[in-house]
Amino acid sequence: MIQSKIRIRTKNQSYNVIVGNNLIKDLLKILKNNSISFNKCLLVIDNKVPKKFINKINFLLKKKNKFTYTFNSSEINKSQKTIDKLLDILLKKNFHRTDCLISIGGGITGDVSSFTASIFKRGIKFINIPTTLLAQ
């Protein structure tokens, strides 16, 4: 498997973008190698993502306290209502800035998830697992 790491540097922080094929099997190694740790995570999942894929991620994250929100990633759901639902879950489950939101799906899933992660408590950790070429 070919894997590339791209270092993104901004004025306030820097982070890695990992690009490759079938990286899911190496998810825990990638998290460890990039010093990404968290106790709780919210998985935001496009309902078109195959169950086999989701089961693999759930298995890999079995030791984590995780919650799931699955939705139809259509333009109509790229909305404040969806963002409010995600924020409500994060609040009710007592997420902290050290916890994580993981997006699994296409562009709409990534857009809604990344925005939510950026505004919750001034930003929580965000991992995007794109399942479409356009979402990358």
Located regions from the model:
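Glycine/threonine-rich beta-strand-loop-alpha-helix active-site module
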Residues: 78-136
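ATP/NTP phosphate-donor binding region
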Residues: 1-100
